[in-house]
């Protein structure tokens, strides 16, 4: 994920320019803007100028979806996950999309913007919910395939819910890792048990700056280790080992005992998370296959392609990948190895992220959160192609093979492998806007 483009959404010019101007020097802007009149004015102007929906789509599968957070222990060495899973009870509240004020602060610090912007973001998006039932009990009696999900640069565990919810609605348990490598906009841990009991969080924010290749590679190695660690912890829960969720939420973690199909484990990630998919597959053979969503290839090692025997699927946006990225991807195509690649026509890098649903058409396209393709159509293609791939290479007894043609790019809104346009990027892979 390229933070400058992602967070441009939250610049004041996107919506404050549309309301009646006032002189910020003569008042406290936060107090002023918190009046109900101004809240309604800003929100209504945002909706009027967006001309589109602002909700994250529900899952289309046969299962209801639950959601909870899990933390395996204390210190920043623990695993921190958002879990999406098939649920047996809908009589629970929907989960909060962005769960803490500090995440808004992290987004603004990633941008290098003022703290006021974070308060404004919280005002506008702090109460947004996702269509997954918070702490709803797991639907027991089945063994579910497991997906570990890795977020992009400047993101965090909860903002890929459109993907997590859709997969869970089709019978997967999805564990979205929140990385502690200073690539998340924000994350936290508890130093010890007293800190957890008192709610004293220790926060880690995005490491701002033009990081060199070696630092990105260090982060990538850590991310891969965190994905493997999350898998090991979930498998130990499945085995019935005594574990505790230090978040102490109203979710019985023992429900997960015996719930995983341990032979059917995959990894999915977007942008830096796509690079993490590649890194993790090269180090951990427990993952049977992987899906790299518009991967940020800059930190990927030159020889890692030779270390991945598992099937690998690249699903790209139309214009994010540079010519150098495509050359790196081509190296993964080797004899006797299962590789597939498609791109979603008219899509941009952030069509894979929930933020594509957080604003309507005009503002979304202006700020590169939406492409020319409808966001729901793009997400539907991404999810269906992923499901078809997962069925084929995890050996699932489902009906996802009805979408096998999507893996080959056989759709008017898809581009088959190696006919995908490339774009100009900076040396660190930051997306740049292409001329139409």
Swiss-Prot record:
SUPFAM superfamilies, sorted: alpha/beta-Hydrolases
Coiled coil stretches, renumbered: none
GO cellular component, one term: high-density lipoprotein particle
Keywords tagged on the record: Glycoprotein, HDL, Hydrolase, Lipid degradation, Lipid metabolism, Phospholipid degradation, Phospholipid metabolism, Secreted, Signal
Cited Pfam families: PAF-AH_p_II
Cysteine disulfide links: none
E.C. number: 3.1.1.47
PANTHER family, per the entry: PLATELET-ACTIVATING FACTOR ACETYLHYDROLASE (PTHR10272:SF12)
Function noted in UniProt: Lipoprotein-associated calcium-independent phospholipase A2 involved in phospholipid catabolism during inflammatory and oxidative stress response. At the lipid-aqueous interface, hydrolyzes the ester bond of fatty acyl group attached at sn-2 position of phospholipids (phospholipase A2 activity). Specifically targets phospholipids with a short-chain fatty acyl group at sn-2 position. Can hydrolyze phospholipids with long fatty acyl chains, only if they carry oxidized functional groups.
Protein name, entry field: Platelet-activating factor acetylhydrolase
Protein source organism: Cavia porcellus
Encoding gene (name): PLA2G7
């Amino acid at each position: 994920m390229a933070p400058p483009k992602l967070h441009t959404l939250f610049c004041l010019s996107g919506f404050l320019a549309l309301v009646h101007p006032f002189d910020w020097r003569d008042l406290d802007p936060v107090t002023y803007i918190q009046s109900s009149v101004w809240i309604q004015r800003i929100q209504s102007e945002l909706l009027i100028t967006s001309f589109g929906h602002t909700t994250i789509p529900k899952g289309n599968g046969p299962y209801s979806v639950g959601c909870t957070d899990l933390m395996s222990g204390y210190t920043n060495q623990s695993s921190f996950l958002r879990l999406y899973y098939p649920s047996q009870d809908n009589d629970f509240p929907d989960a909060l999309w962005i769960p803490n004020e500090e995440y808004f602060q992290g987004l603004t610090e990633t941008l290098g913007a003022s703290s006021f912007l974070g308060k404004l973001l919280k005002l506008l998006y702090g109460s947004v919910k996702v269509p997954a039932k918070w702490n709803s009990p797991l639907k027991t009696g089945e063994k579910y395939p497991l997906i570990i999900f890795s977020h992009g640069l400047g993101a965090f565990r909860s903002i890929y819910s459109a993907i997590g919810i859709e997969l869970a609605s089709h019978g997967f348990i999805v564990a979205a890792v929140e990385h502690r490598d200073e690539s998340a906009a924000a994350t936290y841990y508890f130093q010890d048990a007293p800190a957890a009991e008192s709610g004293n969080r220790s926060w880690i924010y995005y490491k701002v700056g033009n990081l060199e290749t070696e630092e990105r590679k260090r982060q990538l190695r850590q991310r891969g280790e965190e994905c493997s660690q999350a898998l090991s912890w979930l498998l130990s829960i499945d085995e019935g080992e005594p574990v505790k969720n230090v978040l102490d939420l109203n979710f019985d973690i023992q429900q997960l005992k015996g719930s995983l199909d341990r032979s059917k484990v995959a990894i999915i990630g977007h942008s830096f998370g796509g690079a993490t998919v590649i890194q993790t597959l090269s180090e951990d053979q427990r993952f049977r296959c992987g899906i790299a969503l518009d991967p940020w290839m800059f930190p990927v090692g030159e020889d890692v392609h030779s270390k991945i025997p598992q099937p690998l699927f690249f699903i790209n946006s139309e214009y994010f990948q540079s010519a150098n990225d495509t050359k790196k991807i081509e190296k993964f195509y080797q004899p006797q190895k299962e590789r597939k690649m498609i791109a979603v026509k008219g899509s941009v890098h952030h069509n894979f992220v929930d933020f594509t649903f957080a604003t309507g058409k005009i503002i979304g396209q202006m700020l590169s959160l939406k492409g020319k393709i409808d966001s729901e159509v793009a997400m539907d293609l991404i999810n269906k192609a992923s499901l078809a791939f997962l069925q084929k290479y995890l050996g699932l007894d489902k009906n996802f093979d009805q979408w096998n043609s999507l893996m080959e790019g056989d759709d008017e809104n898809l581009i088959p492998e190696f006919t995908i346009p490339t774009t100009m990027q900076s040396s660190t892979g930051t997306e740049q806007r292409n001329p139409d």
